């Protein structure tokens, strides 16, 4: 049964959803600006039910971040630190493997690992980290390295992003997180994260990752200087 929307403009969105048509910029802006929050929620659930029925899942993971040292110095970031900062940390392989094992049980399904753009850690160092984790926890899914990290690894190793991803996958990488996407708007990125990959570079790296059989997601950082138009463009 279809609802009686408080905002009748949502009927056009429902028609597109049921026809499995892709929404456009105007549709996205309407969904942001309509006062009919319950109507938007109903539409979202309509899509969820069509795609997944009543299935859902819970993931038990551990975050194991190897370092917070980062050369990027993004204005939005409260995580990254300079090497000379007394509070900065960089774990050894042994410390990483030990931390992953703390509180480990068969219920743990994933290790989630991201870090700063460290000026001294090499691609081989990260590959050895992955191999050590796979040897110790062969059943655990390794989700690691944002597209931004991959771009930095490639730059430092003087390799293509594809070659970097191949090496990491061979070492045990199973998938990637979606961090570093922020907002794809060039205008916004120049202000909040000008040292990171631009939007096109981020997406190109993700496409390369997917072409190699790796899966990833994509985050969106909002609530700062971006516009509603920037958000919709990011989602599309």
Label every model-predicted segment.
Residues 1-63, 67-71:
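Flexible, acidic/Gly-rich N-terminal and inter-domain linker regions that tether
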Residues 16, 233-236:
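Short, intrinsically disordered, charge-balanced linker/junction segments flanking boundaries
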Residues 39-84, 88-114, 176:
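N-terminal pre-triad scaffold of radical SAM enzymes
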Residues 83-234:
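Conserved Radical SAM active-site core
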């Amino acid at each position: 049964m279809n609802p009686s929307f408080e905002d009748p403009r949502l009927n056009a969105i429902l028609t597109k959803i049921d026809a499995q048509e892709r929404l456009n910029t105007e549709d996205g802006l309407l969904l942001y600006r309509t006062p009919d929050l319950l109507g938007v929620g109903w539409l979202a659930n309509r899509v969820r039910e069509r795609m997944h029925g009543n299935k859902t899942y819970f993931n038990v993971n551990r975050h194991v971040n190897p370092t917070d040292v980062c050369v990027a110095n993004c204005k939005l970031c409260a995580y990254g630190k300079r090497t000379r900062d007394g509070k900065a940390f960089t774990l050894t392989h042994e410390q990483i493997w030990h931390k992953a094992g703390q509180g480990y049980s068969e219920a743990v399904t994933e290790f989630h690992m991201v870090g700063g753009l460290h000026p001294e850690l090499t691609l081989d160092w990260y590959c050895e980290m992955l191999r050590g984790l796979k040897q110790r926890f062969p059943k655990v899914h390794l989700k690691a390295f944002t597209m931004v990290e991959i771009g930095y690894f490639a730059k430092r190793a003087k390799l293509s992003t594809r070659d970097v991803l191949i090496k990491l996958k061979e070492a045990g990488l199973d998938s990637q997180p979606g961090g570093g996407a922020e907002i794809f708007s060039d205008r916004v990125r120049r202000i909040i994260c000008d040292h990171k990959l631009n939007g096109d570079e981020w997406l190109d790296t993700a496409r390369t990752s997917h072409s190699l059989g790796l899966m990833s997601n994509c985050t969106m950082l909002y609530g700062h200087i971006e516009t509603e138009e920037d958000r919709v463009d990011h989602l599309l």
